[in-house]
């Protein structure tokens, strides 16, 4: 083995030697690889972070990345020219306030062991930021004492804990949360301390507050900090009563005062400030004091002495009374006054000084005052000039003497009646003041006691859909207006009077009245037309009269506007849709006046006026249009809403509101029902189906266009030609009952139209009989035993009742239970079910009847009869009053004694104990008038228009009625007594009127035909179910 290895080694050496000997020795690789390095994030925040280092190399190499501490970050073998990436490298967080850095370098070593090095890559880590301070230090600087109590409060007035009147030493430091605080110094014995609170703002950091204490009885030393007065200079001379501006350098909360006057708050900016103070009206030196707060909140003051001199007095100044000045109101017009004054320039003042050359305009009597030295003679004149603006001595001497007096108080007063020189109205005159015969002053005045030119009021419409105007409607002289109306004057050039040539000798060539100011419109109601002052020929007096009685007043109009044809226009509102104020009332005739006004309040009323009447209410449809007038089978409970069969159309009427303009000429009133135009007269409602209908009418207006404001009384109607339905739930058809027993009866009624009105239950022993005779021994008529009305118009009704079964002695057979239902439209239905009633064993005899009678009110009864008789037994038959409550009360009086019967039925061959039966019930009844019942029955079976209607199955309806309506006239229950006894007397009062009709209530004044009963009947029954009856006819 060893030999072979040695041989192989020798062979290799020989081979190499052989190659070298051929002259082809290879060149050695000495070129280092090129490598670069980069980092994905060179700047990291202070917290822990990470970076990714990557780079490129141009040949196959081993790449090693290290940090500046020599620690290897990663080693990567790159097979060929390409890129490399190190895994993410964690960077430790920086806890210092300065930033730190870490540098990285990559080396690449190729196969020939050549090494290339990249440039250095640095990663910076930011330092930790210092947190914003939240506290500040307040230093207490005590001047004059070594310690003192203090109180510290925050901005909300809350005491800082531990510092409520707590003693601290000089230069004490107190750490508190940043903010605004107030420091109050406490008392120190023997020392005078600060008397004000100190505001300290610690929001921006530490502050010091200085608290100055001085020994009692010593002068307070000059505080730290100062304020300097810049102007006025020391010793400046100013006039007493004048205003002086004081300027100073920077301070806070500065106030200025002069002597002992009230302080004035100064205006302060960032570098300086000022305040304006009024110096006293006296002579001598005064002190101006300026005080404020320094930068640390301490009080700082400065003073300045100035000299005050007496202002020169100008005597002879004429001043009008302040309470007579004619000022402007909130509407921009001069206030009302009979006398007064106002300063006006009238074009002679200048823009540079608008108060120059102002005249005092006066009207009425004006009070003046003039200042003059005491003890001097004061003469007052009213002068006119003769060509120059200032009166000459001759003008003065020729003037009117207003007053001549020796001045005592220094101020003299006088009055001037501006109407004394009427021919000089609008011309400048002069109040001349002459003092001691030598000093002369002048005050020009202009009297103006006349109003402007008369306006002429006119009316026109406003451009909106609602407004309308009818001038001189139907030659009535009235203008009718709907909605707002525009009031104006056609004269845009109204001038004040007197305007024109001045009298000879005046200082003005032209008169100069105060000038036109405004127009206002006044509406005087018809209730004031007889006011005599409205006929005043003086237009100014007439203006006062108009204002005293007008009820609608427009706002003043100061400008004529842009449309010359409608100058000085103003809108007067009316009606609910108008939002314009003021508003006129409907159906009131007004006179429209215009009043013009000048600059001193003189007013002129228009010589003419317009008559206007406002109407914003449309016509009214009166009464009902259609009404049910068919009483068959029964009247409608709501004849103006619920219609059946025949209705009567009256079409109502239409009228404009009282005082309105009237109906639009040529318009007629038409109505429609179900799309059909309807005419006055009878109307068969069977032409229409049964739903609800709205009565339509054409678009009517009055002459101004106001639409109808009310619909017909019955704007909606319900056509109901369908009979109600009814069926029995109990008793069971063909059920068998013993007489005297209780039969439970229940019927259900419904109506899909106007609703159920009432249900009545009857028992009957005859069926299919229509002769209306009363048979014996059975009654043979339907006899009512229960009734129920529905008052709320319900669509369904259920009636539960009990009936004590009745049967003749030894009788057995069918009894017919009948339910009669009437709906609110007057339609009716009868339903019948039959049961079998057998006489009870003890039902062997009928109750015995006592005497009975029907007699007039306050008459005596004549009891007659003791059997089943129906006749006028004693000739006292009553005649009913069918137009209202009857004056004849029918009193039914009877005395019935039940029989003591013996039970003859012996089913077991033995004699049983006799059973005594008692009277159970005595009932009073009125028989439905036979003639009227025959009409109803014939109507239901033959003549009802509904039987020919296209909206019902006429054949089925006829068959149904044919089966149910073939019955005799029913007996209507009037009252009963239900106490079991061996005998019973029963009295009952009746008004004779059939309650199928009488007592029906309607929401209108229409009456319903009333019908009386044609018989009064009584039925007496016992506990065994046997019965007797009696009756008395009623005279027709």
Swiss-Prot record:
Localization terms from the record: Secreted, Cell wall, S-layer
Lineage: superkingdom: Bacteria
Transmembrane portions of the chain: none
InterPro entries named among the record's database cross-references: Ig-like_fold (IPR013783)
Disulfide bonds: 74-86, 256-275, 642-754
Gene Ontology process terms (BP): cell wall organization
Main location class: secreted
Metal-binding keyword on record: no
Signal sequence residues: 1-17
Role: Shape maintenance, possible protection from noxious enzymes or exogenous and unsettling DNA, and may mediate homotypic cell-cell contacts.
Note: The hydrophilic C-terminal region rich in aromatic amino acids could be engaged in interactions with nucleic acids, and the bound fatty acids and the N-terminal region could serve to anchor the layer to the outer membrane of D.radiodurans. The HPI layer contains about 30% beta structure and virtually no alpha helix.
Protein name listed in UniProt: Hexagonally packed intermediate-layer surface protein
Native organism taxonomy: Bacteria, Thermotogati, Deinococcota, Deinococci, Deinococcales
Gene this protein is translated from: hpi
């Amino acid at each position: 083995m060893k030999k072979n290895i040695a041989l192989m080694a020798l062979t290799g050496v020989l081979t190499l030697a052989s190659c070298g000997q051929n002259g082809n020795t290879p060149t050695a690789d000495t070129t280092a690889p090129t490598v670069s390095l980069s980092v994905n994030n060179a700047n990291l925040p202070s917290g822990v972070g990470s970076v990714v280092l990557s780079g490129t190399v141009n040949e196959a190499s081993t790449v090693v990345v290290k940090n500046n501490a020599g620690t290897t970050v990663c080693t990567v073998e790159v097979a060929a020219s390409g890129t490399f990436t190190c895994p993410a490298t964690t960077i430790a967080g920086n806890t210092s306030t300065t930033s730190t850095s870490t540098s990285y370098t990559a080396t690449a070593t190729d196969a020939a062991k050549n090494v290339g090095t990249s440039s250095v890559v640095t990663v910076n880590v930011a330092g930790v930021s210092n947190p914003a301070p939240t506290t500040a230090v307040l230093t207490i600087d005590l001047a004059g004492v070594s310690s003192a109590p203090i109180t510290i409060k925050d901005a909300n007035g809350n005491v800082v804990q531990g510092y409520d009147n707590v003693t601290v030493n000089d230069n004490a430091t107190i750490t508190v949360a940043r903010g605004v605080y107030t420091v109050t110094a406490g008392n120190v014995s023997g020392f005078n301390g600060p008397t004000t609170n100190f505001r300290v703002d610690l929001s921006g950091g530490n502050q010091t507050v200085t608290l100055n204490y001085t020994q009692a009885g010593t002068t307070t030393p000059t505080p730290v900090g100062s304020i300097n007065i810049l102007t006025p200079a020391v010793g400046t001379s100013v006039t007493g009563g004048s205003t002086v501006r004081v300027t100073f350098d920077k301070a806070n909360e500065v106030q200025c005062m002069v002597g002992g006057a009230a302080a004035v708050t100064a205006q302060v900016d960032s570098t300086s400030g000022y305040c304006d103070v009024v110096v006293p009206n006296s002579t001598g030196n005064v002190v101006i004091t300026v005080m404020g707060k320094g930068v640390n909140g301490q009080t700082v003051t400065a003073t300045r002495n100035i000299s005050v001199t007496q202002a020169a007095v100008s005597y002879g100044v004429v001043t009008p009374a302040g309470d007579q000045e004619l000022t402007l109101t909130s509407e921009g017009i001069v206030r009302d006054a009979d006398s007064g004054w106002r300063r006006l320039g009238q074009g002679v003042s200048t823009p540079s000084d608008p108060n120059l050359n102002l005249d005092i305009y006066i009207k009425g009597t004006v009070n003046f005052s003039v200042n003059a030295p005491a003890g001097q003679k004061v003469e007052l004149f009213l002068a006119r000039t003769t060509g120059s603006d200032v009166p000459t001595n001759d003008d003065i001497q020729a003037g009117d003497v207003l007053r001549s007096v020796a001045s005592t108080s220094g101020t003299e007063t006088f009055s001037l009646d501006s109407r004394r020189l009427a021919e000089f109205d609008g011309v400048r005159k002069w109040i001349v003041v002459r003092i001691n015969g030598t000093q002369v002053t002048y005050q020009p005045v202009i009297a103006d006691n006349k109003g402007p030119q008369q306006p002429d009021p006119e009316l026109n419409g406003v451009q909106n859909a609602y407004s309308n105007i009818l001038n001189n409607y139907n030659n009535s002289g009235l203008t009718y207006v709907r909605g707002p109306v525009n009031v104006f004057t056609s004269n845009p050039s109204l001038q004040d009077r007197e305007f024109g040539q001045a009298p000879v000798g005046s200082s003005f060539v032209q008169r100069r009245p105060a000038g036109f100011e405004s127009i206002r419109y006044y509406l005087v109601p018809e209730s004031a037309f007889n006011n005599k002052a409205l006929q005043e020929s003086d237009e100014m007096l007439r203006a006062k009269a108009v204002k005293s009685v007008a009820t609608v007043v427009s706002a003043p109009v100061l400008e004529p506007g842009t449309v010359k044809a409608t100058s000085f226009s103003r809108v007067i509102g009316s009606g609910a849709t108008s939002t314009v104020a003021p508003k006129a009332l409907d159906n009131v005739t007004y006179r429209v006046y215009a009043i013009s006004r000048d600059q001193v309040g003189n007013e002129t009323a228009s010589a003419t006026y317009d008559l206007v009447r406002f109407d914003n209410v449309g016509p009214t449809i009166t009464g009902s249009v259609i009404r049910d007038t068919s009483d068959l089978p029964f009247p409608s409970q709501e004849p103006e809403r619920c219609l059946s069969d025949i209705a009567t159309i009256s079409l109502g009427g239409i009228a404009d509101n009282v005082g309105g303009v009237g109906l639009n000429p040529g318009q007629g009133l038409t109505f429609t029902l179900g799309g059909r135009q309807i005419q006055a007269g009878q109307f068969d409602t069977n032409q229409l189906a049964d739903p609800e209908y709205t009565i339509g009418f054409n678009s009517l207006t009055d002459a101004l266009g106001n639409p109808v404001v009310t619909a017909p009384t019955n704007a909606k109607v319900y056509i109901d030609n369908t009979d109600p339905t009814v069926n029995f739930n109990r008793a069971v058809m063909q059920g068998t009952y013993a007489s005297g027993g209780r039969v439970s009866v229940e019927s259900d009624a419904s109506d899909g139209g106007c609703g159920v009105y009432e249900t009545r239950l009857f028992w009957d022993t005859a069926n299919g009989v229509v002769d209306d005779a009363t048979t014996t021994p059975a009654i043979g008529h339907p006899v009512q035993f229960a009734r129920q009305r529905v008052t709320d118009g319900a669509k369904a009704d259920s009636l539960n009742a009990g009936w004590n079964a009745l049967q003749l002695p030894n009788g057995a057979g069918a009894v017919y239970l009948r339910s009669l239902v009437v709906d609110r439209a007057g339609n009716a239905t009868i339903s019948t079910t039959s049961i079998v009633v057998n006489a009870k064993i003890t039902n062997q005899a009928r109750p015995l009847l006592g005497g009975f009678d029907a007699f007039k009110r306050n008459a005596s009864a004549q009891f007659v009869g003791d059997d089943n008789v129906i006749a006028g037994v004693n000739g006292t038959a009553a005649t009913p009053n069918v137009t209202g409550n009857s004056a004849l009360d029918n009193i039914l009086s009877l005395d019935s004694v039940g029989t003591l019967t013996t039970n003859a039925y012996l089913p077991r061959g033995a004699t049983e104990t006799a059973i005594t039966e008692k009277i159970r019930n005595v009932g009073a009844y009125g028989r439905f008038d036979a003639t009227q019942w025959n009409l109803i029955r014939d109507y239901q079976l033959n003549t009802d228009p509904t039987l020919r209607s296209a909206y019902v199955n006429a054949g089925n309806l006829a068959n149904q009625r044919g089966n149910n309506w073939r019955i005799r006239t029913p007996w209507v229950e009037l009252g009963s007594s239900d106490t079991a006894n061996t005998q019973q007397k029963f009295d009952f009062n009746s008004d004779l009127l059939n309650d199928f009709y009488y007592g029906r209530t309607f929401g209108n004044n229409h009456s319903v035909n009333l019908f009386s009963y044609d018989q009064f009947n009584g039925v007496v029954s016992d506990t065994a179910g046997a019965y007797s009856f009696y009756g008395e006819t009623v005279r027709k």
